[in-house]
From Swiss-Prot:
Modified-residue entries (Phosphoserine), positions: 124
Keyword Repressor applies: yes
Protein name in UniProt: Transcription factor MafG
Modification N6-acetyllysine, positions: 53, 60, 71, 76
InterPro entries tied to this protein: bZIP, bZIP_Maf, bZIP_sf, TF_DNA-bd_sf, Transcription_factor_Maf_fam
Organism this protein belongs to: Homo sapiens
Biological-process GO terms, alphabetical: adult behavior; in utero embryonic development; negative regulation of transcription by RNA polymerase II; positive regulation of gene expression; regulation of cell population proliferation; regulation of epidermal cell differentiation; regulation of transcription by RNA polymerase II
Tissue specificity: Highly expressed in skeletal muscle. Also expressed in heart and brain.
Pfam families with a match to the protein in the record: bZIP_Maf
Protein family according to the UniProt entry: Belongs to the bZIP family. Maf subfamily.
Cross-link for Glycyl lysine isopeptide (Lys-Gly) (interchain with G-Cter in SUMO2), residue positions: 14
Positions of the UniProt region annotated as Disordered: 1-24
GO cellular component terms listed in the entry, alphabetical order: nucleoplasm; nucleus; RNA polymerase II transcription regulator complex
Function: Since they lack a putative transactivation domain, the small Mafs behave as transcriptional repressors when they dimerize among themselves. However, they seem to serve as transcriptional activators by dimerizing with other (usually larger) basic-zipper proteins, such as NFE2, NFE2L1 and NFE2L2, and recruiting them to specific DNA-binding sites. Small Maf proteins heterodimerize with Fos and may act as competitive repressors of the NFE2L2 transcription factor. Transcription factor, component of erythroid-specific transcription factor NFE2L2.
Amino acid sequence: MTTPNKGNKALKVKREPGENGTSLTDEELVTMSVRELNQHLRGLSKEEIVQLKQRRRTLKNRGYAASCRVKRVTQKEELEKQKAELQQEVEKLASENASMKLELDALRSKYEALQTFARTVARSPVAPARGPLAAGLGPLVPGKVAATSVITIVKSKTDARS
């Protein structure tokens, strides 16, 4: 029975004496079914059977460990990718939130200005209408004048920003 070179990480071909002088490579030992292995083990000594089964178990465990490492690395990469995407989304939402807060503050200021204006218009007496259109207008109602003036102010401030 020969043993593989321990210095090399790659699996070396290991030959085991088998039935009718046949030998098994590590790959064959790992890939064969239990039934095939048992057929191959017939006629070998108890010690050889134990060594061969131990070798098979060691090789299979090595394979499982390798696939586990690959799976762990893949999962880690996927989680890091998801983390980056979520961080980008958080930054985007924080930016939108800040923008909406600014917009809300601007709207509050406009609202307060409109309320102040409406109060001043409601307190001040309305001057009678003059000019050529005055006859067709009739008496001016303070609420309507104030609403028209307020709308004009809002539109002119909005247009000035654009």
